Amino acid sequence: MMACRTLCLVVVMVASLGTSGVGGRSVEGASRMEKLLSSSNSPSSTPLGFLSQDHSVNKRQVFDQACKGVYDRNLFKKLDRVCEDCYNLYRKPFVATTCRENCYSNWVFRQCLDDLLLSDVIDEYVSNVQMVGK
């Protein structure tokens, strides 16, 4: 009897979460990210562009050698973590690669900050991008 009540309670909770619009932010964020990435003219930002490149995926270096600013491993890790988390949110390889382009100085990185709810510390991240940038 107790197991039946617990099961019914779980079913009711799951059903109410499904109809409450809990997943709305992800859908909204995904459509904004798709629109942002489709407006970019970079070949790596096309949804299937990564398939035309080498299929094996190597672990990305912590820092980008094209970035000519201050070399600070912790700073690069912090910026790279935003792109990794954004990739984990959308599970699209082109999100991670486009996020890192131009030493993190791009609109996808900014959108990732917003989608990861980091807008309250955006000034700190902008400052970090300027430090490592070109």
From Swiss-Prot:
The modification D-phenylalanine is found at residue 63. One of its GO terms (biological process) is neuropeptide signaling pathway. Stereoinversion of L-Phe (form CHH-A-I) to D-Phe (form CHH-A-II). InterPro entries: Crust_neurhormone_CS, Crust_neurohorm, Crust_neurohorm_sf, Hyperglycemic, Hyperglycemic1. This is Crustacean hyperglycemic hormones isoform A. Belongs to the arthropod CHH/MIH/GIH/VIH hormone family. CHH is the most abundant hormone in the sinus gland of isopods and decapods which controls the blood sugar level. Has a secretagogue action over the amylase released from the midgut gland. May act as a stress hormone. MIH may inhibit Y-organs where molting hormone (ecdysteroid) is secreted and a molting cycle is initiated when MIH secretion diminishes or stops. Residues 1-24 form the signal peptide. Produced by the medulla terminalis X-organ in the eyestalks and transported to the sinus gland where they are stored and released. Present also in the ventral nervous system. Its main location: secreted. The modification Pyrrolidone carboxylic acid is found at residue 61. Pfam families: Crust_neurohorm. Disulfide bonds join 67-103, 83-99, 86-112. GO terms for molecular function: neuropeptide hormone activity. GO terms for cellular component: extracellular region.
